[in-house]
């Protein structure tokens, strides 16, 4: 378990972990990914809180600073998936053509627009959450990684030619998925001003990420690393935006 956790940290962050280089990303590290999400979420909440002290409550600068730190700590891994997936979904042609576009090193207009939208929405939502419930930032980041476990549940195929997809797609058994969803719902209860707001936010977020992944399976023939990254970022964004909106009620 510790080796899987170390691999998950090495894969999803810039943190070097002993022995992780010899363990490829697979079932165990994917199961442990929400633990990494919780750590990243705690870091994000701390940065947002510090930013609010410097720039003032609800300042967009504190939210954008938080997003910037997350991008650095994760090496921009997931946001790159947002760009590639958006470009793949935006192109015409069969799955092979879409996958080729995703593997291309350049970023098209769909990818640029998607990245800008995700960063802006996350930054503004994080800024709002610094005043209405900073724990919601941790919850949002965690929800993205739990969504990744859901996307890798049994019966979900990998797209043809995807190295990461072939290692993690279909690896997560139903009890593992259910356990992480239960944990997410449990910790979401105190994350908002009212106990019902957090659960609603994460349910909407996880559903959005799962729906995106399902569409990508239909469009590409399976999931890829880019699809996982885009599902993570979408769920994080939707969770933060939904909770920020509900907390204003």
Swiss-Prot record:
What's its top-level EC category? transferase
Q: Where is this protein found?
A: Cell membrane
Instruction: Note the topology in the membrane.
Output: Multi-pass membrane protein
User: Which InterPro entries does the record match to this protein?
Assistant: CobS
The GO annotation for biological process reads: cobalamin biosynthetic process
Query: Mainly localized where?
Result: membrane
Provide the family line: Belongs to the CobS family.
Fetch the PANTHER family from UniProt: ADENOSYLCOBINAMIDE-GDP RIBAZOLETRANSFERASE
Name of the featured protein: Adenosylcobinamide-GDP ribazoletransferase
């Amino acid at each position: 378990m510790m080796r899987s956790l170390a691999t998950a940290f090495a894969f999803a962050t810039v943190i070097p972990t002993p022995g992780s280089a010899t363990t490829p990303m697979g079932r165990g590290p994917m199961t442990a990914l929400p633990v990494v999400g919780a750590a990243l979420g705690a870091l994000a909440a701390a940065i947002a809180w510090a930013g609010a002290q410097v720039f003032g409550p609800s300042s967009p600068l504190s939210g954008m600073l938080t997003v910037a730190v997350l991008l650095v700590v994760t090496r921009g891994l997931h946001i790159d998936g947002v760009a590639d997936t958006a470009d793949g979904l935006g192109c015409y042609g069969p799955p092979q053509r879409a996958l080729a576009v995703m593997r291309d090193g350049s970023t098209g207009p769909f990818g640029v627009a998607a990245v800008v939208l995700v960063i802006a929405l996350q930054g503004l939502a994080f800024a709002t959450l610094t005043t209405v419930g900073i724990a919601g930032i941790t919850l949002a980041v965690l929800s993205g990684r739990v969504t990744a476990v859901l996307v890798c549940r049994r019966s979900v195929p990998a797209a043809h030619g995807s190295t990461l997809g072939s290692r993690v797609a279909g690896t997560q058994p139903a009890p593992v998925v259910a356990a992480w969803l239960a944990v997410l719902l449990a910790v979401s209860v105190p994350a908002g001003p009212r106990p019902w707001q957090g659960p609603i936010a994460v349910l909407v977020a996880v559903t959005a990420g799962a729906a995106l992944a399902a569409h990508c399976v239909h469009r590409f023939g399976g999931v890829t690393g880019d699809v996982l990254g885009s599902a993570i970022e979408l769920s994080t964004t939707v969770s933060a935006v939904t909770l920020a909106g509900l907390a204003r009620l």
